[in-house]
């Protein structure tokens, strides 16, 4: 983040922007903007990204377009102490990339076992919701990875964060955006 001036960073942070690397240069973009601009992922594979996009969209409609995969990928690519992920709050042991790889692998493995080799992104909406319901209840017999209910909770929280954790998200809900602790003066 040395390439980004502090003032520009703080202004970007106020609108939910994160530092993404585009063409070798760090720029401030929201996850939605990063998704729209097809910013290359740094850590997740295309298969993991497809699973995360599909899972996020099934959990919270609009999560894919809001950039859930770009958000998670950016967050697991930075030092753990800087991450804004719920995984950090829930004391998941860093590196967070290991947790997300295992979680997304477990989703894929359980989906393929239950649905004849089809990964989660290839399921129809009803199958995805059935799978998520079983996942939420820890009832997927073929699940191999971090606890299914815990993975459900964290992926749902990530999806909610990118869709509704912004000023635009608050506006969608018809809720006035108010900072929890507003600064007393400009920094």
Model-derived features: where do they sit?
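Generic secondary-structure boundary/loop-capping signal
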Residues: 1, 41, 57, 117, ...
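Coiled-coil-like amphipathic alpha-helices with heptad-repeat character
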Residues: 1-2, 151
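Long, amphipathic alpha-helical surface segments
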Residues: 140-187
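C-terminal segment of N-terminal export signals and the immediately downstream linker at the start
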Residues: 3-8, 21-58
């Amino acid at each position: 983040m040395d390439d980004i001036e502090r003032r520009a960073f703080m202004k970007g942070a106020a609108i939910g922007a994160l530092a993404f690397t585009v063409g070798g240069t760090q720029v401030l973009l929201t996850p939605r903007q990063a998704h729209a601009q097809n910013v290359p992922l740094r850590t997740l594979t295309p298969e993991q990204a497809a699973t995360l996009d599909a899972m996020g969209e099934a959990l919270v409609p609009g999560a894919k377009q809001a950039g859930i995969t770009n958000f998670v990928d950016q967050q697991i690519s930075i030092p753990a102490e800087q991450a804004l992920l719920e995984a950090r709050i829930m004391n998941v042991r860093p590196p967070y990339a290991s947790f997300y790889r295992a979680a997304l692998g477990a989703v894929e493995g359980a989906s393929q076992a239950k649905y004849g080799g089809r990964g989660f992104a290839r399921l129809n909406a009803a199958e995805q919701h059935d799978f998520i319901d079983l996942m939420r209840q820890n009832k997927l017999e073929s699940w191999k990875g971090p606890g299914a209910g815990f993975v459900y909770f964290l992926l749902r929280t990530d999806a909610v964060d990118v869709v509704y954790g912004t000023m635009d998200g608050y506006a969608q809900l018809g809720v006035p955006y108010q900072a929890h602790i507003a600064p007393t003066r400009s920094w």
